[in-house]
């Protein structure tokens, strides 16, 4: 009896000690916890209103003349006949910057190689690079001369006369949808991707061919962010002033690193941009605002990555669509992801069990990775 009482007292003491430790950590880190947890809980509870009603669009609506001011920059480099007289399955816009020549070359020789896509996959995919002008005006003339040479060699640069900076990403989005509307409106699908994104084009083409055969409409697919709160810290790259966006939650949107819309959605988004305030410089969020106006909701695809780089493994390559953060290894990954070692790796019962175990190990982490979710391990 005496021993039992001692055990009970010891257990209560340990509980009290643990609670004190937890409370101490919370008190020290409360500001951090409040920002990253409480704000997310608060914004997620608010997202239903944002996604269900149009008051957000009314607050950001502008006249057609005002909207045109954001997307009326003159073209410096262009090629209007890219899609002419072609049955284009996919128009793929790569968001690049003037100085990223090596990235563009890597893309042209791997997943963006139109000849490979036509010969090996039997479809027409047109790849073009969207950009503004170099912010540093001191080297502007030299850079433009190099870009003209590049364009003469490859005929795939779409450049407008705006400063190519983070705060002009929405202007680059407007460029993409305007150019599509004017020059490639008949494309079945439109994709927007960063120039440090790896795209497994064979997997993407097979996926889109299946959707095309089903005559899918109202498609906007990618890695979906739901209930994300605006960042109010001034020192953040993603800082959002209250006077620009006063709501507690952003509308649902896909990660701007890579997403796909069907042709009808591309047309609707373009129309939405004609009456919305594009000074919202976070292009992913602006896309979500346009989608509300267009009556379109984003769809999650577990093999579109967020901001993170996906694990390297044949079991991942077999179904991957995009992976983000590849500045110098695109050629290596292309060779690895499309090589013979990937084909049939999950065939048969043992193959399925093996790849399921591998993907669970690589993807099901107890912390946030911003790449494929754990759900991808079970598909």
Curated annotation (Swiss-Prot):
User: What stretches pass through the bilayer?
Assistant: 13-30
Family statement drawn from the similarity comment of this UniProt entry: Belongs to the glycosyltransferase 31 family.
Q: How does it sit in the membrane?
A: Single-pass type II membrane protein
Pathway-wise, it operates in: Protein modification; protein glycosylation
Subcellular localization: Golgi apparatus membrane
Q: Which organism is it from?
A: Danio rerio
Q: Which domain of life is it from?
A: Eukaryota
Q: In the UniProt record, what gene is named as encoding this protein?
A: b3gnt5a
In this entry, the parts of the chain located on the Lumenal side of the membrane are: 31-379
UniProt keywords (A-Z) are: Glycoprotein, Glycosyltransferase, Golgi apparatus, Lipid metabolism, Membrane, Signal-anchor, Transferase, Transmembrane, Transmembrane helix
For this chain's UniProt record, which GO biological process terms are given?
lipid metabolic process; protein O-linked glycosylation
What is this protein's record name? Lactosylceramide 1,3-N-acetyl-beta-D-glucosaminyltransferase A
Concerning PANTHER family, the annotation shows: BETA-1,3-N-ACETYLGLUCOSAMINYLTRANSFERASE (PTHR11214), LACTOSYLCERAMIDE 1,3-N-ACETYL-BETA-D-GLUCOSAMINYLTRANSFERASE (PTHR11214:SF21)
Reactions mediated catalytically: a beta-D-Gal-(1->4)-beta-D-Glc-(1<->1)-Cer(d18:1(4E)) + UDP-N-acetyl-alpha-D-glucosamine = a beta-D-GlcNAc-(1->3)-beta-D-Gal-(1->4)-beta-D-Glc-(1<->1)-Cer(d18:1(4E)) + UDP + H(+); a neolactoside nLc4Cer(d18:1(4E)) + UDP-N-acetyl-alpha-D-glucosamine = a neolactoside IV(3)-beta-GlcNAc-nLc4Cer(d18:1(4E)) + UDP + H(+)
Leading EC class? transferase
Q: What job does the chain carry out?
A: Beta-1,3-N-acetylglucosaminyltransferase that plays a key role in the synthesis of lacto- or neolacto-series carbohydrate chains on glycolipids.
Q: Does the keyword Transmembrane helix apply?
A: yes
The entry annotates sugar attachment on 57, 113, 168, 277
According to the UniProt entry, its GO molecular function terms are: glycosyltransferase activity; lactosylceramide 1,3-N-acetyl-beta-D-glucosaminyltransferase activity
Enzyme Commission (EC) number: 2.4.1.206
| Key word rRNA-binding present | no
Topological domains annotated Cytoplasmic: 1-12
Example of a GO cellular component annotation carried by this entry = Golgi membrane
Coiled coil stretches, renumbered: none
Kindly summarize what the UniProt induction comment says about this protein's expression: Hedgehog signaling is required for expression in embryonic lens.
